[in-house]
Design a protein with these regions (language model features):
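Noncatalytic alpha-helical scaffold of FAD-dependent oxidoreductases
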Residues: 1-217
C-alpha cells in the first residue's frame, strides 16, 4: 500500500453561484489540492468544498462538538431523512425543499487531521451511480445531466456530487491515463433510480465516461 505522511486539511465549505463554478471547473481544480461541489437539482447554487493540505503538526481549528452535531448529524442526516421521505410522498415539494437545503448546508471554515475532514457520517440510505470522465469534459457532462433532469421533469431529492482527481497509471483505475472528473448521482433508496440512472449513463458514455466498479451502472 502506498501511503503518505499524516497531514492536516484546511477546509473551506461555502455556497457559490452554480454557473460560475461550472464554467471555471478546470481552473478551480488546478488551483487547490482537493476541490469538489454538491448540487441540489432545481437550484442555482453549488455547495463547494475546497481542501488544502498542511503539514502534520500545523495548529488546527477543528469544528466544535456542537457544530458537528448540528451540521453533520441533525442537518446532514436527521433533517435530510425527513426531506427525502417528504419528497417521496409529495414529489412536487422537492424543488422548494432543495432550495431550502442549499441555503442551510455548507458554509463553514475549519482545519483538522485529514481523516476528520475527508470522512463524513451518512445515515440516510441511498442508491448511487458514479462515472469518471476526462476532466476537460466534466462541465459539459454536468450540463448534460441538468438537461436530462429538466427534460424528463424529474424531481430529484438527492444532491449530485462532482469531484476531480489526478491521472493515475494503474490499469484498473477509472483515472488511468487522464486527469479525471467524477460525477455521482443518487436517489433515496425507496425511489426507483432506473430511468434516472440510465439517462445519466447515456450522457456519461457520450463524454468518455468510465463507471465506478463498486457502484450501480
Amino acid at each position: 500500500i502506498q501511503c503518505v505522511p499524516a497531514f492536516v486539511l484546511d477546509a473551506v465549505e461555502r455556497p457559490e453561484p452554480l454557473d460560475a463554478v461550472v464554467d471555471d471547473l478546470e481552473t478551480r481544480a488546478d488551483a487547490v489540492d482537493h476541490f469538489e461541489f454538491y448540487w441540489f437539482p432545481h437550484t442555482a447554487t453549488a455547495l463547494t468544498k475546497t481542501n488544502t493540505r498542511l503539514p502534520a503538526g500545523t495548529a488546527t481549528r477543528p469544528l466544535t462538538a456542537t457544530s458537528r452535531l448540528v451540521d453533520d448529524v441533525l442537518v446532514g442526516n436527521v433533517v435530510h431523512q425527513s426531506v427525502c421521505s417528504a419528497g417521496r410522498a409529495a414529489p412536487g415539494l422537492v424543488p422548494g425543499i432543495n432550495r431550502l437545503s442549499a441555503r442551510v448546508w455548507g458554509d463553514r471554515t475549519f482545519s483538522d487531521a485529514s481523516h476528520r475532514v475527508f470522512a463524513t457520517s451518512r445515515g440516510v440510505r441511498f442508491r448511487e451511480m458514479e462515472y469518471a470522465v476526462p476532466l476537460e469534459n466534466l462541465a459539459s457532462a454536468f450540463r448534460g445531466v441538468q438537461r436530462v433532469i429538466d427534460e424528463n421533469g424529474w424531481h430529484v431529492e438527492f444532491p449530485i456530487e462532482v469531484r476531480v482527481a489526478a491521472a493515475d497509471d494503474l490499469w484498473l483505475s477509472t483515472a488511468t491515463g487522464r486527469a479525471t472528473g467524477y460525477l455521482a448521482v443518487h436517489r433515496y433508496w425507496k425511489v426507483d433510480p432506473t430511468a434516472y440512472f440510465a439517462a445519466v449513463e447515456e450522457v456519461m458514455l457520450v463524454h468518455g465516461g468510465r463507471p465506478h466498479w463498486g457502484k450501480m451502472h
